[in-house]
Amino acid sequence: MKLFTLSKKLTSLLFVLSFSFSSLAYSSNGHFLALNYHDIIDEEDVVPPFDRMEVNKHFLEDEFVWLKKNGYNVVSVQAVLDAAEGKSTLPDKAILLTFDDGYLSFYTKVFPLLKKYHYPATVALVGKWMDGQVTADDPGKPLMNWAQVREVAQSGLVEIASHTYDFHTGIVGNPQGNTQAATVTRLYDDPMLVYETEEQYHARIRAEMFKSADFIFQHAGIHPRVMVWPYGEYNEMSIAAAREAGMMMTMGLIDGSNTLANLSAVRRMIIVDDPGIKKFAEIMTGLRVEQNVRVAHLDMDYLYDKDPEQTEKNISSVVQRIKDMHINTVYLQAYADPDGDGN
């Protein structure tokens, strides 16, 4: 198990499982929803089982049509910001559309649909990927070029957001060499056997926020106003750093509705598994049958072993069991009791 090990795998697994159980009905009066998509594939293609983030173009258009027929109002980032400043009010059933990673499919498949339905949307760019540099989490899919980015931005329909420059990856976060989300992890220096200090961490986060914003301005002439956190991971320090760099709105990946009072951490509902219009309607209306929380208690002592390789095997085994048992909530016993006496 290489990238993100227990932390990343548990977070990702529980996120996708809990996504299935959420009820998303909401009222208006300053509330809004946000949907999150990634890559969009051709109508004749079948979403591969290993890529849960792909959505078929005809399903996407079906979802756009459903939103219009059911009274949802797709709004822009500017409309949300104006409402937050008291310059206007949000319409009933306001909703943001967001697309992560800057894939070419946004230009070739999504953008024509936005123009057809007059829907605004936000697209989040990963600077290092746009720069042509390969990273551990680079999906290897075609991306938009800068001319296309400028074109969609100039249309008036698309908000260009930062998805960081180089934080869409993992960094070493412990002596075992496990990598974790760069935004929220204190870097572990293996040769020196130390973690970065709070001051070093803050400096790294701040530098990344400014670099990502400056990179987009350099190539597109746009100062991004929105930071979209890779993997949905953020904290108060990263939010403050993004704000310093001019990105007053940031977005994560937690289900639920939003209020104008909390634009520093906008909740977004990720659309996975190419749900089809029936499941999409259930997601949007919250009419699904209430499902129980399935809980597991995990004792960290049973994961740890003096042999690092055995620890890795233990982690892999428990993550697989959590998936197989459809567990959506895990309580960690995050303290050591090696002699088993309860103290």
Q: What does each of the following model-derived ranges do?
A:
Residues 3, 25-95, 261-264, 268-288:
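N-terminal pre-catalytic segment of deacetylase/amide-hydrolase enzymes
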Residues 80-83, 106-110, 137-153, 172-174, ...:
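Alpha-helical scaffolding within the catalytic cores
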